[in-house]
Amino acid sequence: MFKKLFGDPNARKLKRFQPLVAEINLLAEDFANLTDEALAQKTVEFRAKLDKANSDEETEEILDEILPEAFAVVREAAWRVLQMRHYDVQLLGGIVLHKGQIAEMRTGEGKTLVATLPAYLNGLTGKGVHVVTVNDYLARRDAEWMGQVHRFLGLTVGLIQSSMGPAEKIENYRCDITYTTNSELGFDYLRDNMATTIQEVVQRPFNYCIIDEVDSILVDEARTPLIISGQIERPTEKYLQAAEIAKQLVPQVEEDGPGDYEVDEKARNVLMTDEGFAKAEQLLGVTDLYDEQNPWAHYIFNAVKAKELFKKDVNYIVRGDEVVIVDEFTGRIMPGRRWSDGLHQAIEAQEGVTIQKETQTLANITYQNFFLLYPKLSGMTGTAKTEETEFEKVYNLEVTIIPTNRPTKRQDLADVVYKNEKAKWRAVAEECAQMHETGRPVLVGTTSVEKSEIISAYLHELGIPHNLLNARPENVEKESEIVAQAGRKGAVTIATNMAGRGTDIILGGNSEYMARLKMREYFMPQIVKPEDEGNFAIAGSGKNSGGQGFDTNNKQKKKTWKTTLDIYPTELPTDLEQQLKEAVKFAVDQYGNQSLTELEAEEKLAIASENAPTADPVVQKLRTVYHAIEKTYHDLTSVEHDEVIQNGGLHVIGTERHESRRIDNQLRGRAGRQGDPGSTRFFLSLEDNLLRIFGGDRVAGLMNAFRVEEDMPIESKMLTNSLEGAQKKVETFYYDARKQVFEYDEVMNNQRRAIYAERRRVLEGQDLKEQVIQYAEKTMSEIVEAYVNPELPPEEWKLDKLLDKAKEFIYLLEDLEPKDIEDMTVPEIKTFLHEEVRKAYDLKEAQVEKSQPGLMRQAERFFILQQIDTLWREHLQAIDALRESVGLRGYGQKDPLIEYKQEGYEMFLEMMIDIRRNVVYSLFQFQPQRQPQQPQAV
């Protein structure tokens, strides 16, 4: 109705940008006639214009003014360097990104190329542009591949990888455009704010950021804080004992019924009943689980949570002697990530693996607050519209939908719902069989490792060949192989959450992938160091690779790069195979036999299979062979491609509605890319988690109402509405949870900014003497206010205690007597003490400098940083504890958030006072050794 009256706001927005696109197109011919040098010279012209700007506002105005020319320059450069030309819709995407908005672009519409436009334009300012992707591999690929365009035009391109040292990072952050991952960017920010000298700081002030897959970073990851932690000792036997006790506690089946604890699946929490407390105390032989001397509550709660809410092969897998988290959004394993607050240890105890040490937070920030540090932020994704409200409310980011270059031909078929899971799996298997018969490729999306194995078993029964892609290490190894052939005729692929797999399923098979896999087969065994085999397979996903590969049982197993033969559409002709062997021999001659790490070898192949310019003769030789193999395969896959299109394209089956409609849409988006035909259908059951947890009683009622056979699908409007409702409920529930995290973290965020700003001042400050003297004067004023009440007559003032306290801090004031100040007013006492402090400080400085010139300046910086870091760390723990306890105040009719803000602020002020006082005390107590010695950096 509104759309009819007022027009679609999205269409209105795009219409506003249309004249800019027309202007860029008009310039195309002029720029096509320029020489390479003249085209690159444009960068110098643009920069000269920008140099005239005197403020950030003026800079933005000039950028808007030169946008059509700059975009036309990038478009021409991309054509010359990459043989890729931006479509009009990609220009629209670039404009939206430059305006600091989110561009929603469908899978396969070339988001990577779109980012080059705003990155170049904003890179001209020299203040730095960060292009953020989800993993190291993609960052490296984009920096090498898209970076060519920027380098051709004279901008510098940097890349940040987790393995780099500080010097390398500084150099890369100084570039005009830097490609990096969200986690590395966040951790570098935290590390910079723990640095002890300004030379250790790697980042520049933030300017402009483009986030790829923005929904997965700003929404899915929003609740996950980035934490830098140090280890603390906790007795491991408590975890083991708690795990034993949790086994003996029983859950309540119905509300207020018998049982030791109640499980709240919605909030992912457990609540102990009075019987539960009593039983646990009796089993442990203690009187109180909350006893401060011997606390048990924390351990018991975590053990019960581990038992009830964290399922093996769904939330985590056990690999060797460790518990590894499985990412609920992408279905990938996340090695190195651990649950906090002792939960990971509780799961380790439950699984009987070695319990690792608990950690203490040294610095933390959520992605929400981190990305809000950028003055200008933008992002791209295939699915953002469903989370539009959140982007606008939390990040102040508008979402604009960019139309596809070719019209979509995908059919989304109606959901079918079965009474129970068993019937659903049978129906899915039958649908796969039908599609397999007709020669259509099928992709089945599941929500966990466990579910993917159930459907796999059903397909085995029917004798249907299929590939399985989940977080199990043995399957991850084969990810690139599986995805390469997922679009082949009649292929059946089962995958846990394809979100973030970053890979395109090409109908008829992906000849680029296949060629690269064939190259690996010959290249890797000759080049990779034997000790590196099996430790690591390429981590990353994207155009040319996928997955994280791991050694499943930590024993050195012989690595094989052989792939299953049926992946290739044909055998290589003898002359081509000979050419490949010669190229590999040449590589061995140049690099040495088995001389590279697996990652280095993968990188050589990655560059060989793309168009990045290279001076390495080995890569050039490999590239020639790669193109020949790719062409051989492509001639055959293109025939199969046409057949698959005739048959109707890729069919995507969803086996459960995800908690977020966005993830469902991502799965759907795998079919019908770039104007290909395709179809999608969801198979559901009334026993699915989503309906069970959030659909509640309505669904249970429906279940009884439908007295149908198990294997009869139920198609009912009422049920579909229930489903939609349940999904919206979950989305709102999680949105509220994220909003709450955001509101609570906002309190911390203001404090974090204040403390980091103070820290940076200290790091950059040349003369900290004045700062320490101010600290000391402030401390003296506070002491005066504590012992002197101006309301009382002077004879009742506690001047002796006042001076005793002052001398505790500054022993050089020991000659002062109460009689020296008894005739003064309060302001006069303060002024007098301030003067005495300055004299005392000069004395102290002379004494320290005598032992080693310049030492006092170092001592000032050292003590201020040491106190800030120590007390901030304690403050983080105290704030965490406050946050845990403040929730209970809701029962006392108080708003927990307001209480948290108030008390958090008071705690922060106290911490700032403690920092000041401790610095003053430490500096006056500081006795330098005779031999030249510097205070150690913290």
Curated annotation (Swiss-Prot):
Cystine pairings recorded for this chain: none
Gene Ontology CC terms: cell envelope Sec protein transport complex; cytosol; plasma membrane-derived thylakoid membrane
InterPro entries: Helicase_ATP-bd, P-loop_NTPase, SecA, SecA_CS, SecA_DEAD, SecA_motor_DEAD, SecA_preprotein_X-link_dom, SecA_SF2_C
Broad class of the protein's primary localization: membrane
GO molecular function, one term: ATP binding
Listed Pfam families: P-loop_SecA, SecA_DEAD, SecA_PP_bind, SecA_SW
Subcellular location: Cell inner membrane; Cellular thylakoid membrane; Cytoplasm
EC supergroup of this enzyme: translocase
Keywords attached to this entry: ATP-binding, Cell inner membrane, Cell membrane, Cytoplasm, Membrane, Nucleotide-binding, Protein transport, Thylakoid, Translocase, Translocation, Transport
The enzyme's E.C. designation: 7.4.2.8
Entry membrane topology: Peripheral membrane protein
Residues at which ATP binds: 90, 108-112, 504
GO biological process assignments: intracellular protein transmembrane transport; protein import; protein targeting; protein transport by the Sec complex
Catalytic activity reported: ATP + H2O + cellular proteinSide 1 = ADP + phosphate + cellular proteinSide 2
Function recorded in the entry: Part of the Sec protein translocase complex. Interacts with the SecYEG preprotein conducting channel. Has a central role in coupling the hydrolysis of ATP to the transfer of proteins into and across the cell membrane, serving as an ATP-driven molecular motor driving the stepwise translocation of polypeptide chains across the membrane. Probably participates in protein translocation into and across both the cytoplasmic and thylakoid membranes in cyanobacterial cells.
Annotated HAMAP family: SecA
Self-association state and partner proteins as the record states: Monomer and homodimer. Part of the essential Sec protein translocation apparatus which comprises SecA, SecYEG and auxiliary proteins SecDF. Other proteins may also be involved.
Identification of the protein by name: Protein translocase subunit SecA
